[in-house]
UniProtKB/Swiss-Prot annotation:
Record key words, sorted: Autophagy, Cytoplasmic vesicle, Lipoprotein, Membrane, Protein transport, Transport, Ubl conjugation pathway, Vacuole
Protein name: Autophagy-related protein 8
PTM summary: The C-terminal 9 residues are removed to expose Gly-117 at the C-terminus. The C-terminal Gly is then amidated with phosphatidylethanolamine by an activating system similar to that for ubiquitin.
GO biological process, one term: mitophagy
GO MF annotation, one: phosphatidylethanolamine binding
Gene Ontology CC annotation, any one: fungal-type vacuole membrane
Similarity comment text for this entry: Belongs to the ATG8 family.
Organism whose genome encodes this protein: Cryptococcus neoformans var. neoformans serotype D (strain JEC21 / ATCC MYA-565)
Protein function: Ubiquitin-like modifier involved in autophagosome formation. With ATG4, mediates the delivery of the autophagosomes to the vacuole via the microtubule cytoskeleton. Required for selective autophagic degradation of the nucleus (nucleophagy) as well as for mitophagy which contributes to regulate mitochondrial quantity and quality by eliminating the mitochondria to a basal level to fulfill cellular energy requirements and preventing excess ROS production. Participates also in membrane fusion events that take place in the early secretory pathway.
Gene that encodes it: ATG8
Propeptide section residues: 118-126
Lipid-attached positions, Phosphatidylethanolamine amidated glycine: 117
Site entry: Cleavage: 117-118
InterPro entries: Atg8-like, Ubiquitin-like_domsf
Amino acid sequence: MVRSKFKDEHPFDKRKAEAERIRQKYQDRIPVICEKAEKSDIPTIDKKKYLVPADLTVGQFVYVIRKRIKLAPEKAIFIFVDDILPPTAALMSSIYDEHKDEDGFLYVLYASENTFGDLEQYAISE
């Protein structure tokens, strides 16, 4: 698991208290920390913390990230939660329930390539 810069910069107790406060105040939203994967050549996002509607899909969240980093349409982007590529159609609430951190935030990494898996296994040979 890749270490989050947000975790390094903020003590556990403060992160946990903030996530609890957010969840109490906005029960239909999910607290997400979105960070760029370290060795990715993709632009850095301008803000890390997001309050995401529970019924937003992973694909819709990827669209939000693309817009925030002003990524060209022809450029690929992948997001990872706990080093896995979540299904595009999955609801963020499901991903949160399965992968939220002990501090109450969902940590998402984004990259310009699939850095955690080998896409070659899915290649179609002619």
